Amino acid sequence: MKLGGNDGMFDTALSMNPTMPLYDDKGNYYQPSSPTGARNPVAELKDIDNNGQRLYVLGTAEAKLNILRSEKQTLNTSLSYSLHYNDLKQQYFTPSTSGESYWNGYKGRAEVTYQKWYTQRLEWLVNYALDVQNHSIKAVAGYTYENAHWERLQASNNDFAYDNIKWHDLGSGSYLTDGKAQMATGQSASKLIGTFGRINYNWKKLLMASASIRYEGSTKFGKNHKWGAFPSASIAWEIANMDFMKNASKVVKSLKPRISYGVTGRSDFDSYLSLATYSTKGSYLMNGEWVKGYAPSVNANPELGWEKSLSVNIGVDFVLWNRLRGSIDWFDRQSKDLLYNYTAPQPPFVYNNILVNVGTTQNRGIELSIDGDIFKGTKVEWTSGINYSYGTTKLKVLSNNMYQASYVELYQKPGVGTSEYFFRVQEGGKVGQFYGYEYAGVEDGKMLIYTDEGEKVPVSEADAKYKRYIGNGTPTSFLSWNNTLRYKNFDLSIFFRGAFGFDIFNMRRYGMGLQGAGTDNVLRDAYLKDKNIVTGGGVISSFFLEKGDYFKLENVTLGYNFTPKPNKILNSMRVFVSAKNLFTLTGYSGNDPSIVSVNGLTPGVDSNSAYPTATQLSLGLTLRFK
């Protein structure tokens, strides 16, 4: 499996000065005039070898036993085992002609990495069902055991006699002889045990209720909080089946208000965060010999526990005239006991920070889903559906009596020696807010920003106290629109989607949008739209923020269904042509805004190395055999 040269080469090709040659006078690849300059992308892609071989095994086995089966009752049990196994070998080599070798003064670098990880899961289930007159009960109980393991070995060496040696003779590089070769190993393991039960009740198809409890324990947590209980419950009422709704039965086919509450636990992070771990800390001379030293690197926290997600949902489902279907939901989702590093007193703690459960975020909003048969029972049938959601996420809690923090800074700006962060979140504030300087115009070629007192100063006089919230990378609403049309044997599907109410930090404009970008390539706007601004980049400011709203035609598929003559082999045949990413309506000047990540705590930062979205055309054939 060829992994390619370097993931950042697309950005490098864009930013490289277009007047620079690919080769020098001697026929070798041209290298930049400084080690911080843009690397030669052709040299990086053609000369660097980055290969990998992966073995992936997915296996499952299950045994079922029917204990009781009658007209009114059923009882069965099952035992299942699954294995997910990955074995990865990676080999990397950069030759003596590469920019890395040129600027670091060695002849090539080779690296070999081996990784193996697997997850074993054993699950036992017992299912029971009872139907008596107007009552229907379904219950399930179970036990889960999960074992996960990961291990890694990495070794690298530099300065080889010949480039064609690559990684095949890793020990021949001079760095091993000089004691500068690198080697690293690591492994982790975790176990999870869970028991659970769930019961569903249905009375006359009028009242539906469900309740469940899951009790889980994980080795990842502190000794005092390894176990967690996660309950859930829901209830729904089918009003359309009530006697007083009979007169409206031709119109109202279903009207079901419902409410649900649930708690889930999160444990998908590193295995040893609750333990005091050790790492190497230099070498020390003992009895005439140098001995590698070890010291604590993380404080232990026996109180480290589960992150919990609490969800309340109130909604209603409806079906009208047997052709209009939909649902309306209000939701309140809270994530509690979120992990964060806080300042720890010394003593008693060895390190000055500790990972603890403190934070709480809250996501509230509404969701609307409607689809209907616009044309039904006619030559042309058309079904159309719209999904819309609106919501905001806030940081509700960041501190408690023991651990205090006034704000959290997230996503450090890339670059050497930088200390700026794109985001700041404080208690009561929205998640995903950009924090930086407010653009105030230009003067004598210098970008200006506002001070905390509203004055205008050059970026060179920027002070951290001038920063403010300048935008938000999280969309306030999402919209999707799906359409399906049928005419005789033809079918056509058209899908749109969009996001609204958010900003994107244009990293390409930040890096290449001003004339003062040095010897790098720059955007055309640097000499046209923004021609008056020569300097002032390098800081996070609203100048580089743009509205990210978009609405795009995501997919169009046209198909034709053939009806084969009676035969013993073929049941049906369908041919189709499909197109993806046909167009996007947006005011954003950077990459396709739909591929910019807008989820999580650090949304709305565009990537320099993201490839442009391509329009894809495909032709397909579907055959169904008897």
Provide a role label for each language-model segment.
Residues 477:
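Metal-cofactor-binding active-site regions of metalloenzymes
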Residues 285-297, 334-358, 392-474, 482, ...:
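Surface-exposed, extracytoplasmic segments of Gram-negative outer-membrane nutrient-acquisition systems
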Residues 102:
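The feature captures the catalytic groove of carbohydrate-active enzymes
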